[in-house]
From Swiss-Prot:
Gene Ontology molecular-function annotations: transcription coregulator activity
Spans annotated as Disordered: 221-263
Primary localisation category: nucleus
Protein name: Mediator of RNA polymerase II transcription subunit 4
InterPro entries documented for this protein: Mediator_Med4
Function in brief: Component of the Mediator complex, a coactivator involved in the regulated transcription of nearly all RNA polymerase II-dependent genes. Mediator functions as a bridge to convey information from gene-specific regulatory proteins to the basal RNA polymerase II transcription machinery. Mediator is recruited to promoters by direct interactions with regulatory proteins and serves as a scaffold for the assembly of a functional preinitiation complex with RNA polymerase II and the general transcription factors.
GO cellular component: core mediator complex; mediator complex
Ranges in coiled-coil conformation: 62-106
Record's keyword terms, sorted: Activator, Coiled coil, Nucleus, Transcription, Transcription regulation
One BP term from GO: regulation of transcription by RNA polymerase II
Compartment(s): Nucleus
Gene: MED4
Pfam family membership, one: Med4
């Protein structure tokens, strides 16, 4: 087998074996009897062969040192490649996240464009929006009126009676170690409250306020001051006037916006 097809390690081992055999022959020839010694020509060839093997061993050792340096450089390059692979993987993850965010943004943008196109095809006048907003605010379905005070029958949401009948109103019982009333007890309390309100002619007034505020047949709201102290008439016209002013302001705004739209 040619030495060029062997690895550096195998070549070094083969050269060492050859040097060992040649050295053994020379030593045996040296200690052999005179009549058994080889001729001087053969001895000279063995010496030349040993010198050539020594040169070949030195050249192979130098080649092995060069290959060791190359292997060291390759190890460093492998580490750099590993680091670059980690950076590439990290960038790939960031790219996927950016792609997901971009896809989501594109989807949302298309939805907004679709909504804009629908709004352009089916426009709604500002007068209709103002009327709709006025209907919502006039019914006090979202919040109490700005001029609402204690005793005002314009309903703020939720009412006191509803809060007292709810779970939040019974939270003190749970804290003290008692069980909350069941649904039947709540329904019974609601029926009792409704019956009390119907019997006294007062609607949507808390139980705590039924003994304090009452409507008289004249249309005035009276507040009871205490046992035997009589009652005091409350003026609710300011609330009605304020509500009327709010309606007039809304009507004026709607008419002005309608005129501006028509222009």
């Amino acid at each position: 087998m040619s030495s060029y097809h062997l690895s550096t390690k195998e070549r070094l081992l083969a050269i060492v074996d050859d040097i060992e055999i040649i050295s053994k022959e020379l030593i045996e020839n040296t200690i052999a009897p005179k009549h058994q010694k080889m001729s001087s020509a053969d001895h000279g060839q063995l010496v030349e062969l040993l010198v050539s093997k020594d040169k070949e061993l030195k050249a192979t050792l130098q080649l092995a040192a060069e290959q060791a340096g190359i292997e060291k450089k390759m190890d460093g390059l492998r580490e750099q490649v590993k680091e670059q692979d980690e950076e590439i993987n990290q960038l790939q993850k960031q790219l996927k996240e950016a792609e997901h965010i971009l896809a989501t943004s594109i989807f949302q943008g298309r939805q907004k464009l679709s909504s804009i196109n629908k709004a352009v095809k089916r426009p709604v006048s500002s007068e209709e929006l103002i009327k709709f907003a006025h209907r919502i605010s006039a019914s006090n379905a979202i919040c109490a009126p700005l001029t609402w005070q204690q005793g005002d029958l314009r309903r703020p949401y939720p009412t006191d009676i509803e809060m007292r009948l709810g779970f939040l109103g019974k939270s003190d019982l749970n804290i003290n170690g008692h069980n909350a009333p069941n649904q039947n007890n709540l329904n019974e309390m609601q029926r009792n409250a409704a019956g009390a309100g119907a019997g006294s002619g007062v609607a949507d007034i808390p139980a705590s306020a039924q003994n304090q505020f009452a409507w008289h047949p004249s249309g005035e709201l009276h507040m009871t001051m205490g046992a035997g102290a009589g009652s005091v008439s409350l003026d609710t016209r300011s609330h009605k006037d304020a509500s009327q002013d709010d309606v007039e302001v809304m009507s004026t705004d709607s008419s002005s916006s309608s005129s501006s739209d028509s222009q």
